[in-house]
């Protein structure tokens, strides 16, 4: 049991950091790469050494508003242009995956679900990729590139 705990701590240490979002790319079945979240989305993902995580990011350009309170259209634009959840994670070095166990999300249907992501670590960069996901009638792969914050 102690060996498992030590191995878990070592694997968590590899991801444990604050990471800044560099890019989000979506690959369509025909190989076309699109930027659903814009050319320069902003965001953070945090992994801690105890196995907790949180992620949030925002579209580029971000939605703007001149009203307070927001109109229904402005609320919809703000919701569609932002994404966030938190929970715990498992890092599986052997499989090359990290699984996010979602405890709370701005999208209620995600609570209690698990998201498995393929990862690549290189230097100060972390790349997380989804398995193919059905979106807009086609299977798409999402790739998020993060840079370790200094």
Predicted regions located by residue number:
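Lipid interaction determinants
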Residues: 1-150
